[in-house]
């Protein structure tokens, strides 16, 4: 049976609702002077911190002076090094868990992870004749 890759299955619709509830208040754009394009009027990159999806810490204050430090990258408040360490210790890849975390704001429980993996698996299959047509 040929899979229609444009089909939206009910599970995807439910997950999309989670993303819809994860929006940024329009008031915060004004409060923090965040522009809605990729650059502000001065050519600087826009602030991405409102999203709380990721944070990069690249400096610290020492004796009142901001100095570079070993960088820290967090996804949804979780240090990426800790995520990777867990994946390595438990001998798993972690792609699906990380994608779920970034999309929906928290790490999945085992039931959510199994469901998410199944959904991704359904859309991961190549259409018939793909390799032949390349």
Question: Where are these predicted regions, by residue range?
Answer:
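Hydrophobic alpha-helical bundle cores within soluble ligand-binding/oligomerization subdomains
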Residues: 1-134
């Amino acid at each position: 049976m040929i899979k229609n890759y444009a089909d939206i299955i009910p599970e995807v619709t439910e997950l999309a609702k989670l993303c819809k509830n994860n929006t940024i208040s329009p008031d915060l754009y004004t409060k923090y002077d965040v522009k809605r394009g990729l650059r502000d009027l001065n050519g600087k990159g826009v602030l991405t911190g409102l999203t709380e999806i990721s944070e990069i810490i690249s400096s610290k204050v020492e004796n009142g002076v901001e100095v570079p430090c070993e960088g820290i990258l967090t996804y949804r408040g979780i240090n990426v090094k800790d995520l990777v360490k867990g994946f390595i210790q438990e001998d798993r890849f972690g792609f699906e868990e990380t994608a779920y975390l970034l999309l929906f704001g928290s790490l999945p429980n085992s039931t959510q992870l199994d469901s998410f993996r199944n959904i991704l698996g359904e859309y991961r299959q190549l259409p018939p004749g793909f390799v032949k047509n390349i």
